Swiss-Prot record:
PANTHER family: 39S RIBOSOMAL PROTEIN L32, MITOCHONDRIAL, LARGE RIBOSOMAL SUBUNIT PROTEIN BL32M
Keywords: Metal-binding, Mitochondrion, Ribonucleoprotein, Ribosomal protein, Transit peptide, Zinc
Protein name: Large ribosomal subunit protein bL32m
GO MF annotations, alphabetized: metal ion binding; structural constituent of ribosome
GO cellular component, one term: mitochondrial inner membrane
Length: 188
């Protein structure tokens, strides 16, 4: 049995000092009774909770259910709705002005193609054109290289029909396309 140590702080008030002295004497008496050879009730922490009868000890159920009830089961039942919402309340919730779709005032026309788009956002139609042209260029590069890991470590230049390589294009990989350069694809 490990030795225990109790630290007492003596309060300055005489009434509290007397109460503390009485408690200390009772504790000493109980500790002396609990020595080996004396029978005493087991010491240990105890928890006393006042609650509804739902939390009392479960009765022996012989119906064969192996499921034990717990505190969480009753908490989940407490969180269930008790009354049905009226149709008026539901309508107010559904038609709340904060839940309605907000009108967008940042819609503009694309200067290239004329389709509607959001301001400061690339037009979806123009983006699709760029994506298709880029996919064609990548497909042609794949045919020219012969594999995904055989790419040279030089810069790539795309030349369309009727264009010739300039002095800056010397030593670069040149991809030639057999069509006219699109207006949105600049040469530099």
């Amino acid at each position: 049995m490990a030795p225990t140590m109790l630290v007492l702080l003596v309060p300055p008030f005489p009434v509290a000092r007397g109460l503390l002295r009485n408690c200390w004497k009772q504790l000493q008496g109980k500790l002396l009774q609990s020595r080996p050879g004396f029978s005493s009730p087991p010491w240990g922490p105890a928890l006393a909770v006042q609650g509804p009868a739902i939390f009392s000890e479960p009765t022996n159920d012989t119906s064969g259910s192996t499921e034990t009830s717990s505190l969480l089961d009753s908490i989940f039942w407490m969180a269930a709705p008790k009354n049905r919402r009226s149709i008026e309340v539901n309508r107010c919730r559904r038609r709340n002005p904060h839940k309605l779709i907000k009108v967008k005032n940042n819609i503009d026309f694309c200067p290239e193609c004329g389709h509607l788009k959001q301001k400061h956002v690339l037009c979806g139609y123009c983006y699709e054109k760029v994506r298709k042209e880029t996919a064609e260029i990548r497909r042609q590069i794949g045919k020219q290289e012969g594999g995904p890991f055989k790419a040279p470590t030089v810069e790539t230049v795309v030349l369309y029909s009727g264009e010739t390589p300039s002095e800056h294009d010397q030593g670069k990989r040149i991809i030639e396309r057999e069509r006219k350069r699109p207006s949105w694809f600049t040469q530099n």
